[in-house]
Amino acid sequence: LTLGRDGMSVSKRDLITTGLHDLCAGALTPWGTFLVNEEFPFIADPQSRSGWVWEIDPATGAQKRATGMGRMSHEQEALSRGDWYITDDRGNYQYLYKFVPDNPRDLSTGKLYGLKFDRSTNTGEWVGPLDPMRPEADMAAKAGPPTAANSFSKHEGIVRSKRGDGVVFSESGSGADPG
């Protein structure tokens, strides 16, 4: 949308992409493209082409998969110190992910890690690299299934911290183990 001079009216609307599934929040890149997230769980349809972060050039509408960021139910990502931090909105418990690109402007290759968190000490360790085609299953195999003790409860937004030395994100779940 392009806003009018009054900030209240819309002077132009451009549709720049179609064909993506269950879109959620995204992020701007330092080089002028933007990222949109498919909040589509891999487990729902392993054969589907959905469940990716897509990088879109607003000038041309060109879109490409950021395959290095993994296939999962993406919520949002934030850039800090050259690495992308990714929230997963699959359900009650999930890990926080970190993508370290091989080339800062190419989100198709790099290493993907999951954070195994310890709530009792408020510390964690990055586990990986993970298989970007199935990061949730790979992380569960390497760190154990996500629980209230070692992961986070229903990620929502994520942004770079004010100091620029990390990220801030929110959880919207109850934090209690189901069942």
Where are these regions (language model features)?
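Sequence/structural signature of beta-propeller domains
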Residues: L1-G179
